[in-house]
Amino acid sequence: MDLAYMAELPQEEFTERRQKVFAQMQPNSALLLFSEIEKRRNNDCDFPFRQDSYFWYLTGFNEPNAALLLIKTEDAEKTVVFLRPRDPLLETWNGRRLGVERAPQKLNVDEAYSIDYFKTEFPKLTEKLTALYHASDRHPWGDKLIAESAVKFYAVFDWQPMLSEMRLIKSPNEIRLMQQAGQITAFGHIKAMQVTRPNRFEYEIESEILHEFNRHGARFPSYNSIIAGGDNACILHYTENDQPLKDGDLVLIDAGCEFAMYAGDITRTFPVNGKFTQPQREIYELVLKAQKRAIELLLPGNSIKLANDEVIRIKTQGLVDLGILKGDVDKLIEEKAYRQFYMHGLGHWLGLDVHDVGRYDDDRSRTLEVGMIITVEPGIYISEEADVPAQY
């Protein structure tokens, strides 16, 4: 894959998304989104800034302390941004700002104001409107600005369901970026396989993965990396990554890069010393069989539930064949006996967030559509304390 093919979305795509939002808003209403703000790590040091995914989805703007306001009347639509003004002193210390003057052209919006004037301009812009789309409690700093502006609306709607459904269906450009995120993530996993050996620490492998991400233009992981040797792999969200890898153990790696704001997510398990034991191979091949079958079934018109039900049957039958479970397969499935070894779902939506937004419906029975992106990660977890044949 040519990793230089695309590094960001064209501004026209953000404009098109806003037009789709306007089409779903009722007349005489406004939709308001706030950006993320900088967050303190410890005294005088902030965490690296990461934009709110919804705000990014409609703006492509990567600065804190900003707001997007969409205004729809009976006969017109207007897009307004509030953002930090230029400040030469603060920009010398903390980095460049787009500024109010350049924002309309750069972001393709109608008007721009300093965020410092939100409390005075927001009432003027919305004084004749009756409804507001706003996700309260998502950003307390924004809720405070709204309260201080003293604007009252006849109706308030949560925009999250609407925007979540939009985000669920990826455009061709988004898919290309996510393919790149997936490829870079795969490079990291391949590097990990190449450098893993007994007595190396989990964090050493993590550092190799992160370095590979960085080499290909992905500065940050999309979530905290899991490098879990031996029994640590039975802790689903293990992130200590501070133990030595032991000869004869397996190591589970769950890691993904974030590229152009989009998440990669890959989980792989392999032997620390490079060679499976026979029992390890049997479990590995059972999981692989289930994964391949799930991928065959995850097609438009089917559902995650359909694929997961098949995965459960394959695993349960396989565990019976290996003597790990005992009894009738149908009865074991009905009793959920597999849950002690497979305690999570088959996968999740993937996009701007690693656990991306969008409805699943009951039991993940939602019909799959073109443009949805889902992870496929069945697993079998057998802890040291599990009551199973000794070889496992």
Segments the model singles out, each with a brief description of its role:
Residues 1-392:
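Active-site neighborhoods and metal-handling regions in enzymes and metal-associated proteins
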